[in-house]
């Protein structure tokens, strides 16, 4: 049986329990996969704008500092050589992209594994809503009564401004939209708190839309793929327009 989550109201009172969707909250976590996805996500955070100047880019003359022979010094052909003061850097960092290629299936499986870990430990919770008006005091009361950790991840819908304004200034609490839920944020938080609306959007009507491209609009669908008949009609239309232009 898949884990369950306690449902709270804004006052911190338990109003029921909800059986979590099995393939999202009761999967088989793959630690190596989770590590790979989190490392890729952290790498994507890097700006990659680091830059040093080579001997061809530093300012100043590249003249020969002293004659080739007779000084007792090692021969040197430029004042901008790497060993000279003011010289260029050898093999220094240059701007680059740190993004790792991470297939969507890996991202989905890693997130399901992280949520499974939290759900089995009883650290996935659901709140009906954060009320009709934003209130930091009500949010703090909810967290204290329910015993939620100070390292808390709140998952809400993108349109839920009440939740955002209620928790945005509380230390240790991070709020993400349901479409932004990711393995890294789940792992760095001890507890995960879904609003009921966000949970319904995340799992979808039958638990199949959890990782759709537009989780805040689960009713949207991709354009219908063209059928062979459609392709044939389009070809005939193009041919007809060509004949009209050529006068055939």
From Swiss-Prot:
GO molecular function: rRNA binding; structural constituent of ribosome
A Pfam family the protein falls into: Ribosomal_L4
Signal peptide: none
Transmembrane segments: none
Annotated keywords: Ribonucleoprotein, Ribosomal protein, RNA-binding, rRNA-binding
Source species, domain of life: Bacteria
Ranges annotated as biased composition (Basic and acidic residues): 233-248
Record's keyword annotation contains Transmembrane helix: no
One Gene Ontology cellular component annotation held by this UniProt entry: ribosome
GO biological process, one term: translation
Ranges for region Disordered: 48-96, 210-248
Record-linked InterPro entries: Ribosomal_uL4 (IPR002136), Ribosomal_uL4-like (IPR013005), Ribosomal_uL4_dom_sf (IPR023574)
HAMAP family reported for this sequence: Ribosomal_uL4_B
Entry's family note: Belongs to the universal ribosomal protein uL4 family.
Function, as annotated: One of the primary rRNA binding proteins, this protein initially binds near the 5'-end of the 23S rRNA. It is important during the early stages of 50S assembly. It makes multiple contacts with different domains of the 23S rRNA in the assembled 50S subunit and ribosome.
SUBUNIT field: Part of the 50S ribosomal subunit.
Protein name: Large ribosomal subunit protein uL4
